[in-house]
């Protein structure tokens, strides 16, 4: 008779940074795509969590050319390098990142309205 392996207690409010092996692999490498309201109807789209292996300035250049918007890379004190784009580009960024193979669909987290 085989022993059941998952009989450990699980605390959902515990710190995720303790290094417990209860979380599945790959949960920390999400790419977060957020939208921020500016003045009036203007919005900013931010992309955070792209690996350091990729040149973010080249990605911004490709985004600007593909989506016909302005963009830049800013240094955020908490999140590191973050890509900022003008306008609501959430769907476009998701499709583009999956299309070029930089991220899978389940690695993208879209936040906003």
Curated annotation (Swiss-Prot):
The modification N-acetylserine is found at residue 2. The record marks 41, 65 as: Binds 40S ribosomal subunit. The keyword Amino-acid biosynthesis does not apply. Residues 1-21 are annotated as: Disordered. It comes from the Eukaryota. Belongs to the SUI1 family. This is Eukaryotic translation initiation factor 1. It comes from Gallus gallus. The gene is EIF1.
């Amino acid at each position: 008779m085989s022993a059941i392996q998952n009989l450990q207690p699980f605390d959902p409010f515990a710190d995720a940074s303790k290094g417990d092996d209860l979380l599945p692999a790959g949960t920390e490498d999400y790419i977060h795509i957020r939208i921020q309201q500016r003045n009036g109807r203007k919005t900013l789209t931010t992309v955070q969590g792209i690996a350091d292996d990729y040149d973010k300035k080249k990605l911004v250049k490709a985004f600007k050319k593909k989506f016909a918007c302005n963009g830049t890379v800013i240094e955020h004190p908490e999140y590191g390098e973050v890509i900022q784009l003008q306008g609501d580009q959430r769907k476009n960024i998701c499709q583009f990142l999956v299309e070029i193979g930089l991220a899978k669909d389940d690695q993208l987290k879209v936040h906003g309205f």
